[in-house]
């Protein structure tokens, strides 16, 4: 990705945090521009991950803060849970109602409030998240699971809406 060709300083240094923050801003700029339900819009994955494009994006990381050309979204609430047992079963779970009490709908006899991720749709026909029947909206729910050599190491994750990719990166930098 964007950081793959950059020699990272130790994780808690200002230099490392700057590189992480700037790379996440670039990644979110791409996310808000391209991520959509692939059943409704072609996503140029090969081009987005091409070394030539990554190099162009990487070149935008300088000493000064990069200002994304898309609007960033407000913060909301989430809960994350990771668990494992002695038999090797593992779960990485994230639940987010997104805003307030989510959709305001509760499953009868359970008290479980349903989320309102449909809020992330756009009415702009040019948006990758333009509202269409059966389409899934872009969201920030990222339960992580770490693998090595095809074998599970364990679940991981963080809360924090658009901080999640950066938080996951910070966790992985410390493993």
Model-based region annotation:
Residues 1-3:
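Mobile "lid/hinge" segments at catalytic clefts and subdomain interfaces of large enzymes
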Residues 159:
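Short acidic/histidine-rich active-site segments
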Residues 14-18, 162-166, 175:
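Soluble non-cytosolic domains of exported or imported proteins
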Residues 89-154, 162, 170-173:
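Active-site rim segments in enzyme catalytic domains, especially the processed small/beta chain
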Residues 6, 174-175:
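Alpha-helix C-capping/helix-to-loop hinge sites
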Residues 5-97, 109-110, 117:
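Internal maturation/activation junctions in enzymes
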């Amino acid at each position: 990705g964007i950081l793959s060709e950059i020699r990272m300083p130790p994780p808690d240094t200002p230099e490392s945090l700057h590189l992480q923050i700037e790379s996440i801003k670039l990644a979110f700029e791409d996310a808000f521009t391209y991520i959509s339900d692939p059943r409704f819009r072609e996503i140029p994955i090969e081009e987005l991950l091409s070394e030539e494009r990554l190099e162009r994006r990487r070149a935008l990381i300088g000493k000064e803060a990069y200002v994304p050309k898309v609007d960033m979204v407000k913060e909301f609430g989430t809960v994350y849970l990771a668990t494992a047992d002695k038999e090797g079963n593992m779960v990485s779970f994230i639940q987010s109602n997104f805003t307030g009490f989510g959709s305001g709908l509760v499953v009868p006899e359970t008290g479980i409030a349903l989320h309102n991720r449909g809020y992330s749709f756009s009415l702009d026909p040019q948006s990758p998240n333009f509202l269409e029947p059966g389409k899934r909206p872009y969201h920030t729910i990222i339960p992580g699971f770490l693998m090595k050599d095809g074998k599970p190491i364990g679940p991981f994750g963080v809360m924090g809406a658009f901080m999640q990719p950066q938080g996951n990166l910070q966790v992985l930098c410390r493993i």
